[in-house]
A protein has these predicted regions:
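Long, positively charged amphipathic alpha-helical accessory segments at protein N-termini or as interdomain linkers
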Residues: 1-7, 75-109, 120-194
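N-terminal lobe of the biotin/lipoate ligase/transferase fold
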Residues: 1-109
Length: 194
């Protein structure tokens, strides 16, 4: 296993498609057919049936935002823990790209809102959604991050730093891997970013 701080990007199986209904639905179907490896990520340029918590619609112009889902074959991982872990990873990735430090002074600007939102200056920057299949092991965690486009009441990563969805995905996966798997440590990291 690579030493802490060394990228584990080669352990992720990342695919990109131009358009799909929902990356979560695609991975869920593939998991149920036994076709997925652990740490599979599906990113799309455009999602036509994306949704967030409470089945709220999540839509953006093609190519403008990070729309992705990951499949984690860790039956012990509770959906809430993975929501938190991905939320922390998104905050840390944006902080890393923007050159910000994780400290109390930044929390008011960039942080988490329970249970599954990332906010920048009080406006939604990202959302995370976890789903389990009833017939396959593992967990699907989808996330949408406003990178280059956001609705009027929301924020976008490009308000902080100029980057692409592809660059942000690499940082999110790297930040995800940098976190401890210990639930107590994860809970502390999550609370520190609220």
């Amino acid at each position: 296993s690579p030493a802490s701080g060394i990228s584990k990007m080669d352990e992720w199986h990342v695919s990109v498609v131009a358009e799909t209904g929902s990356t979560n639905d695609d991975l869920l179907r593939a998991a149920e057919q036994g076709e997925l490896a652990d740490r599979t990520v599906l990113r799309t340029e455009h999602q036509t049936a994306g949704r967030g918590r409470l089945d709220r619609r999540w839509d953006a112009p093609a190519g403008s935002n990070l729309l992705a889902s990951m499949y984690l074959m860790s039956p012990g991982d509770r959906p809430t823990s993975m929501l938190q872990r991905v939320g922390v990873a998104i905050v840390d990735a944006v902080n890393q790209l923007a050159g910000l430090k994780i400290e109390a002074s930044n929390r008011a600007t960039l942080g988490l809102k329970w249970p599954n939102d990332v906010l920048y200056d009080g406006r939604k920057l990202a959302g995370v959604l976890a789903q389990r299949s009833t017939s396959a092991p593992g967990l699907i965690v989808g996330f949408g991050v406003n990178v280059a486009w956001a609705p009027p009441e929301a924020a976008r990563v490009n308000d902080l730093v100029d980057c692409t969805a592809e660059q942000l995905l690499v940082e999110v996966l790297t930040a995800f891997d940098a976190q401890s798997g210990d639930p107590a440590v994860l809970a502390q990291a999550y609370r520190a970013r609220l």
